[in-house]
Amino acid sequence: MMPISLSLTMAFSLALAGTLIYRSHLMSTLLCLEGMMLSLFILMAMLISHFHMFSMSMAPLILLVFSACEAGIGLALLVKISANYGNDYVQNLNLLKC
């Protein structure tokens, strides 16, 4: 495996591990998700250019658009939760309450 793709795979794995370990705060979970999406974007763009699959050249851009939408919704949710509850602890949230 190429060293760049190996380091991107390691970045994705570390972001995934960070999501699983630091899931007590919503902000740290969102940051780890953004790291995962960024490493997927770069890895997808590199693989498409390496294998000359130019018909799939819009796929990284679509992934980046979905990542931006996810970040916007996540930050809006973070602001709303911190305004209502005063903190961003995930374990204090009961999503079954109205």
Swiss-Prot record:
GO terms for biological process: ATP synthesis coupled electron transport. Belongs to the complex I subunit 4L family. This is NADH-ubiquinone oxidoreductase chain 4L. It is an enzyme of class 7 (translocase). It catalyses: a ubiquinone + NADH + 5 H(+)(in) = a ubiquinol + NAD(+) + 4 H(+)(out). Its main location: mitochondrion. One of its GO terms (cellular component) is respiratory chain complex I. The gene is MT-ND4L. Pfam families: Oxidored_q2 (PF00420).
